[in-house]
Design a protein with these regions (language model features):
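Sequence-specific dsDNA recognition surfaces
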Residues: 1, 174-179, 194-209, 218-251
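A short beta-sheet element
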Residues: 1-19, 33-35, 221-222, 240-302, ...
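Short coil/turn segments at secondary-structure boundaries
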Residues: 29-30, 206-214, 308-310
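A short glycine-rich beta-alpha junction/loop motif
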Residues: 32-66, 273-279, 311-338
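Non-catalytic DNA-recognition/assembly elements of restriction-modification systems
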Residues: 46, 50-95, 126-151, 164-203, ...
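Internal, well-ordered alpha/beta segment that forms a basic, Gly-enriched binding/recognition surface
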Residues: 86-94, 101, 105-116, 121
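Short Gly/Ser/Thr- and charged-rich N-terminal loops/segments
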Residues: 389
Length: 402
C-alpha cells in the first residue's frame, strides 16, 4: 500500500502520476525481477519523478484523471448489468425453457397457452428453475392456481405491452421433444457448439514477422484481448490471409491458456489487426446468431474450463475443435431466434457501445495525462476535450435501462 506525503503531493495526484506512461516506462527500464518482474519497496529510492510543485495543479490533474476513471468504472458496472439481463433471458429461454413450460402447463390445466406464455415472458408467472427432465418436469410446471393469478395480472399491462408479449409468445411450441440433450422444445434442434457459427483460428506468427514500420497492423493475442494494445504488442506488415483480419465488433474466443483466466469470449473493439493463433474469430450470418453464440459461450464457460483443466499441462489448458463438436446445445427455430433478437440485440448493442466508450475514455485519459504533467496542456483545455469526446447521452440511457 502506498500513501502520499501530503506535505509534498496531493493524495489524488499520486495515482495518475504513478500510472503515467513516463513513470511506467522508468519502472520497466529498471529491469526488476527476472522470470517474474517485480518492484520492491526499496526500489522507490531509485525512482526519480518530476511533477508540478503547485498543489492546486496537482489536485486539478488528479481530479481530472479520477473523473474519467469514474466514467470508465460506471460503464463497466452498466455492462455487468446489461450482461446479467442478457444472460437471464438466455437462461429462461434456452436452458430452462420457461415459455414452453408455461404453455405445456396451460394445456394440461385447460388454460390459454399463449396467455400463460405471455405471463412467463413478463415475469408475472414464476416457474421453478432447471432443465426439464422426464422425471422432474411435472414438479417444475406451474399449478392451475399460479397460472390463473399470473394470467389475470396481465391486465395491468398496457395494450401495446400485451401485443408485444403475444407476438413473442406465439413463436414458442406447447411441448417438448426428446433429443441427445434430453428434453428440448418441439421444432428445435440439438446442435454441436462448433456448428453454431464458423470458428476460424488465428494465424501463427514468428519473431521475423514483427516490425515497427509505419502501416503495420497489431497482432492480437490473449494479452491484447484482456488489456488492449500496449507497448508489448507486436506489429507486422507481412502478407496474412484475409480470414485472420479482425475489426471492431468482431466476436473472438480464446480457447487456450490458463483455464481460469484465459478461456473467454470477447467483443473486439481495438481497431483493425491480425488474429494470433489460439484464438477463434467467430463468423456468423445474422446479428441474432452472434448474440446467441456470445451467450452460449458465456453460459458454457464453466464446462469449457473443466474440459481444458482435464488437459492442463504446465498451467495451460485448451479446448479443441473435437471438444466443441462433442458439446451440444439447444438451437431454436428461425421464428424463436428472431423473437429473441428483438429483445437481446438492443442489449448487446448497448453493451458494445459501452465498450467503445470505455476504450475511448481510457485512450483519452492516457493520452492527455503526459501533456498535463508536462504543462503542455492545462486542465481546463483537457476537460474541454474530454467533454467534447465523452458520449454522455448513451451513458445516461444505459443508466436508465439498468
Amino acid at each position: 500500500r502506498i500513501r502520499a506525503d501530503e506535505e509534498k503531493i496531493h493524495r489524488n495526484f499520486l495515482l495518475p502520476l504513478l500510472r503515467s506512461s513516463i513513470v511506467q516506462h522508468d519502472i520497466s527500464n529498471m529491469h526488476v525481477g527476472t522470470l517474474i518482474p517485480h518492484f520492491k519497496k526499496g526500489d522507490f529510492d531509485k525512482l526519480y519523478i518530476r511533477f508540478p510543485q503547485k498543489k492546486e495543479i496537482q489536485q486539478a490533474i488528479g481530479d481530472f484523471y479520477l473523473a474519467i476513471s469514474k466514467k470508465i468504472t460506471l460503464n463497466r458496472k452498466l455492462n455487468e448489468t446489461l450482461e446479467g439481463m442478457a444472460r437471464a433471458l438466455f437462461q429462461s429461454w434456452f436452458v430452462d425453457f420457461d415459455p414452453v413450460k408455461a404453455k405445456l402447463a396451460a394445456v394440461r390445466h385447460g388454460r390459454d397457452p399463449e396467455r400463460a406464455c405471455m405471463a412467463a415472458l413478463s415475469g408475472k408467472l414464476r416457474i421453478l428453475p432447471g432443465k426439464p427432465k422426464p422425471d422432474t418436469l411435472d414438479v417444475q410446471l406451474p399449478t392451475a392456481e399460479a397460472l390463473d393469478a399470473a394470467i389475470a395480472a396481465l391486465d395491468s399491462l398496457s395494450p401495446a405491452q400485451q401485443n408485444s408479449l403475444a407476438e413473442t409468445a406465439r413463436h414458442f411450441p406447447e411441448n417438448f421433444a426428446e433429443s441427445e440433450l434430453g428434453l428440448i422444445p418441439e421444432g428445435w434442434s440439438s446442435v454441436a457448439l462448433y456448428d453454431t457459427a464458423e470458428f476460424v483460428n488465428g494465424a501463427a506468427f514468428k519473431s521475423a514477422d514483427f516490425t515497427d514500420d509505419e502501416g503495420a497492423l497489431p497482432i492480437i493475442k490473449i494479452a491484447e484481448l484482456k488489456q488492449g494494445l500496449s507497448d508489448q504488442t507486436k506489429f507486422t506488415k507481412n502478407e496474412v490471409k484475409e480470414r485472420h483480419r479482425i475489426n471492431d465488433g468482431d466476436l473472438l474466443y480464446s480457447w487456450s491458456g490458463s483455464p481460469g483466466t484465459s478461456l473467454e469470449v470477447f467483443k473486439w473493439f481495438g481497431g483493425e489487426g491480425w488474429l494470433n493463433q489460439h484464438i477463434f474469430k467467430i463468423n456468423t450470418t445474422t446479428q441474432e446468431q452472434s448474440v446467441l453464440v456470445w451467450l452460449i459461450l458465456k453460459h458454457l464457460k464453466p464446462e469449457l474450463i473443466r474440459i481444458a483443466e482435464n488437459k492442463q499441462t504446465t498451467g495451460l489448458g485448451h479446448v479443441t475443435v473435437a471438444d466443441m463438436k462433442r458439446l451440444c446445445v439447444a438451437w431454436p427455430d428461425g421464428a424463436a431466434l428472431e423473437a429473441f433478437g428483438r429483445i437481446a440485440i438492443p442489449i448487446y448493442e448497448q453493451h458494445s457501445s459501452h465498450i467503445l466508450e470505455i476504450n475511448s475514455l481510457a485512450e483519452l485519459r492516457d493520452t492527455l495525462l503526459p501533456k498535463l504533467l508536462s504543462g503542455e496542456l492545462s486542465v481546463g483545455e483537457a476537460s474541454a476535450i474530454a467533454e467534447a469526446t465523452a458520449d454522455k447521452p448513451e451513458t445516461m440511457e444505459a443508466a436508465t435501462l439498468s
